[in-house]
Regions:
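Divalent metal-binding acidic/histidine catalytic loops
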Residues: 1-171
Length: 171
């Protein structure tokens, strides 16, 4: 089971972001897997077999000019709230895109217990923003400075207002 999860983690990290959440959940049971965890892991392997033609596909942008609009970063972020029945911790997920392709993604259990959906979403959004800062610096060092703000797509309106500094308190 441990070797299987290690291989699945490799795939989730490098070529198959679509399995990141499932692998994250399965990896919680590496130290003491039950039969149901092995069944779920094998189900994930069958999914991979059936979708082996899927994966990240990168294409060259129309222009390699740093001023080209296609060289703009954008990200999507979401979170559940208290999704873990044992710890009541939430799970964050994000994907950072460049030229229509995912360049960074993560699905991870939050280290804090959020007291509201807004707080869980804000923790998730802050993780994405940290990754955006890193990616913008990296792209700038590679000669592709980001001249426009990075759009972050978030579905919780109170979280968006918090990020804009328009609200204090929780929902």
């Amino acid at each position: 089971y441990r070797n299987m999860i290690g291989s699945l983690l490799y795939l989730a990290c490098w070529t198959r972001p679509d399995i990141a959440f499932a692998v994250s959940e399965l990896s919680r049971f590496v130290s003491s897997p039950a039969e149901q965890h092995m069944i779920a892991a094998k189900h994930l392997l069958r999914y991979l077999q059936g979708t082996k033609d899927l994966g990240l596909k990168y294409s060259q942008p129309k222009s390699l000019s740093p001023l080209d609009a296609s060289n703009v970063l954008w990200g999507f972020v979401d979170s559940d709230w208290a999704g873990c029945p044992d710890t009541r911790r939430s799970t964050s997920g994000y994907v950072l895109m460049l030229n229509g392709a995912a360049i960074s993604w993560k699905s991870k259990r939050q280290s804090v217990v959020a007291l509201s959906t807004t707080e869980a979403e804000f923790v998730a959004a802050s993780s994405l923003v940290q990754e955006v800062i890193y990616a913008r610096r990296l792209l700038s060092n590679l000669g592709f400075p980001q001249t426009k703000p990075t759009a972050v797509f978030e579905d919780n309106t109170t979280c968006i207002k918090w990020a804009e500094g328009a609200v204090g308190g929780t929902d």
